[in-house]
């Protein structure tokens, strides 16, 4: 399946483009006000004491700036940043090589930390807690364990699936931050800032139009900005107005809700093939030819957040918003929690279906 334009997952093109527009300081970090304020306090206090910052766990949907925040943490602390990921650290020796090369107070960023192997995770525990590395030398009866002292460091772990972290690992993070989807106002500021760095002429209304269709995700906003820039360069006078952005994004099949063909296919499958649900995620994945993990991590979070899809103990259900989106009448159902299809809106004091 071709890569979606509005997928929140990063690509190599995204990494190269995002590097030039990535903020380096918390003062330039747009959105997530609670996270920003807390990190300003924690970083300032650690810097004033000359100590390593407590280990930080950052979780939330992909594309919201977990990697960016790790870069900012290292930059604000004035230390080096070492980057790795859970799948890459296959053996304890891989982790040991990283840890023994850290300088005091350095930041080690581990993306997809929920994918660490159990044997590597066991080595990480004493490193996080006591700044010590347990190494086993030899094999069998002759094997012996030695301890290596490590410089104080900060582990920044990032994950889209915090629920998959083991309790011992999760409990060793002194700072836990959840990143939320961005509102249109913050995304508009992000688009305007990126356009300024890239030298793109953009009107406020054009930036807002891109922001509205970016699914609350900065990575998608920056990607759409680059594509709309291309359209404006060839089809317009190089200036991104709201009309130019609207035409470009319609051409790219990104509608006013930020949905693309995959979103519409999922919602229609729930409505037409499963009578609005509930439907299990495995059945839904088979119906649309997509992997379960992609549905859970990439497609459905935004649909749920926007109120088009509902996750229940019995499976996924389409909401009245989904029916209205397709111009379909919502069925009258009984026993649906939360008055899903809006019976209370129909007036009368009864509020019954």
Curated annotation (Swiss-Prot):
InterPro entries documented for this protein: AAA+_ATPase, AAA_lid_4, DNA_helicase_Holl-junc_RuvB, P-loop_NTPase, RuvB-like_N, RuvB_C, WH-like_DNA-bd_sf, WH_DNA-bd_sf
A GO cellular component annotation in the UniProt record: Holliday junction resolvase complex
Pfam families membership: AAA_lid_4, RuvB_C, RuvB_N
UniProt keywords, alphabetically: ATP-binding, Cytoplasm, DNA damage, DNA recombination, DNA repair, DNA-binding, Hydrolase, Nucleotide-binding
Enzyme Commission code: 3.6.4.-
Binding annotation for Mg(2+): 67
Binding site for DNA: 292, 311, 316
Superkingdom of source: Bacteria
Binding positions (ATP): 21-22, 63, 66-68, 129-131, 172, 182, 219
Catalytic activity entry: ATP + H2O = ADP + phosphate + H(+)
CDD domains cross-referenced by the UniProt entry: AAA (cd00009)
Region listing for Small ATPAse domain (RuvB-S), in residue ranges: 183-253
Domain notes: Has 3 domains, the large (RuvB-L) and small ATPase (RuvB-S) domains and the C-terminal head (RuvB-H) domain. The head domain binds DNA, while the ATPase domains jointly bind ATP, ADP or are empty depending on the state of the subunit in the translocation cycle. During a single DNA translocation step the structure of each domain remains the same, but their relative positions change.
Entry's family note: Belongs to the RuvB family.
Function: The RuvA-RuvB-RuvC complex processes Holliday junction (HJ) DNA during genetic recombination and DNA repair, while the RuvA-RuvB complex plays an important role in the rescue of blocked DNA replication forks via replication fork reversal (RFR). RuvA specifically binds to HJ cruciform DNA, conferring on it an open structure. The RuvB hexamer acts as an ATP-dependent pump, pulling dsDNA into and through the RuvAB complex. RuvB forms 2 homohexamers on either side of HJ DNA bound by 1 or 2 RuvA tetramers; 4 subunits per hexamer contact DNA at a time.
Protein name: Holliday junction branch migration complex subunit RuvB
Organism: Thioalkalivibrio sulfidiphilus (strain HL-EbGR7)
């Amino acid at each position: 399946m071709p890569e979606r334009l509005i997928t929140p997952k990063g690509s190599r093109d995204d990494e190269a483009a995002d590097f030039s527009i990535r903020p380096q300081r918390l003062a330039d970090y747009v959105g997530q006000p609670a996270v920003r304020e807390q990190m300003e306090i924690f970083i300032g206090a650690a810097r004033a004491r000359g100590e390593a910052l407590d280990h930080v766990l950052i979780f939330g949907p992909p594309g919201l700036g977990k990697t960016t925040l790790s870069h900012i943490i290292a930059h604000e602390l004035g230390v080096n940043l070492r980057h790795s990921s859970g799948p890459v650290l296959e053996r304890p020796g891989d982790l040991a090589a990283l840890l023994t090369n850290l300088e005091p107070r350095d930041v080690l960023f581990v993306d997809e930390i929920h994918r660490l192997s159990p044997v590597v995770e066991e080595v990480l525990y004493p490193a996080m807690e006591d700044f010590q590395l347990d190494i086993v030398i030899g094999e069998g009866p002759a094997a012996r364990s030695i301890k290596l002292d490590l410089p104080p460091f900060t582990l920044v772990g990032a994950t889209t699936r915090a629920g998959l972290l083991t309790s011992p690992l999760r409990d060793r993070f002194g700072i836990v931050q959840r990143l939320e989807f961005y509102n249109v106002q913050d995304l508009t500021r992000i688009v305007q800032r990126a356009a300024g760095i890239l030298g793109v002429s953009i009107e406020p209304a054009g930036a807002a139009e891109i922001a509205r269709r970016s699914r609350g995700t900065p990575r998608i906003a920056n990607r759409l900005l680059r594509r709309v820039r291309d359209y404006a360069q060839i089809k317009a006078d190089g200036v991104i107005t709201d009309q130019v952005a609207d035409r470009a994004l319609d051409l790219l099949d990104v509608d006013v809700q930020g949905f693309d063909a995959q979103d519409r296919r999922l919602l229609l499958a729930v409505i037409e093939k499963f009578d609005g649900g509930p439907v299990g995620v495995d059945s839904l994945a088979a119906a649309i030819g997509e992997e379960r993990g992609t549905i859970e991590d990439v497609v459905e979070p935004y649909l749920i957040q926007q109120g088009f899809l509902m996750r229940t103990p019995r499976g996924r259900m389409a909401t009245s918003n989904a029916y209205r989106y397709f111009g379909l009448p919502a069925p009258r159902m009984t026993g649906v929690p939360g008055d899903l299809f809006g019976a209370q809106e129909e007036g009368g004091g009864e509020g019954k279906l």
